[in-house]
């Protein structure tokens, strides 16, 4: 179970709704993955070229999954705050995935403006989930202004590279043990999702890895299973890696000459 802002969700997977081949494939993918939330932006066009409107909103409602609006495409504090306020009116929710991009090539979050916007929105009653880097200090500042969960990236959006800064992500997890951390962006394979879940991260948010795959419906299922498997492995307590071999079969009753040195 995933807990965010004192609210509990049955899944640790969050799924984006952009760039699916057709609305029907989007709907089937969501139903297959059964995510905790589905993200959507006021700025994006609907699936298959459908304009963002009542039809797309009806499709989202049919899935029965809570909607997490985002501020994708925003590059200033005022733009992000205004978009979040509009999203609250349209989708009737205080949840917001806060995105503030600082570089057009890498789509890296502008953590300075992110902190400022997060503080404004939290004071306005929003439950803010900020899309951020793995920078520990920036993440602490987001917590200082009232964020109760963070969404650090694994790699730049849409790259599918997996956790390119594994050390920094593991440090972040170690130093913020009680903060829900959801890996957002950069994952391309279910194995990569399982890996970060094995490290102890609380959830994963995906879009491109599913929507642009050869078979989004089956890929959605694959990621859902990977996230669940990774979490189970973390909770089970994996064995530590060793430099030397260690037999799993007991040596009791083994003939003495088997241990002789040659």
UniProtKB/Swiss-Prot annotation:
UniProt EC number: 2.8.1.10
Catalytic activity: [ThiS sulfur-carrier protein]-C-terminal-Gly-aminoethanethioate + 2-iminoacetate + 1-deoxy-D-xylulose 5-phosphate = [ThiS sulfur-carrier protein]-C-terminal Gly-Gly + 2-[(2R,5Z)-2-carboxy-4-methylthiazol-5(2H)-ylidene]ethyl phosphate + 2 H2O + H(+)
Binding site for 1-deoxy-D-xylulose 5-phosphate: 158, 185-186, 207-208
Region annotation (Disordered) ranges: 243-262
Active site (UniProt): 97 (schiff-base intermediate with dxp)
CDD domains the UniProt entry points to: ThiG (cd04728)
Record InterPro entries: Aldolase_TIM (IPR013785), Thiazole_synthase_ThiG (IPR033983), ThiG (IPR008867)
Keywords assigned by UniProt, alphabetized: Cytoplasm, Schiff base, Thiamine biosynthesis, Transferase
Enzyme class: transferase
Location of the protein in the cell: Cytoplasm
Pathway annotation from the record: Cofactor biosynthesis; thiamine diphosphate biosynthesis
Subunit structure, interactors included: Homotetramer. Forms heterodimers with either ThiH or ThiS.
HAMAP family in alphabetical order: ThiG
Function: Catalyzes the rearrangement of 1-deoxy-D-xylulose 5-phosphate (DXP) to produce the thiazole phosphate moiety of thiamine. Sulfur is provided by the thiocarboxylate moiety of the carrier protein ThiS. In vitro, sulfur can be provided by H(2)S.
Descriptive protein name: Thiazole synthase
Species of the source: Neisseria meningitidis serogroup C (strain 053442)
Lineage, uppermost ranks: Bacteria, Pseudomonadati, Pseudomonadota, Betaproteobacteria, Neisseriales
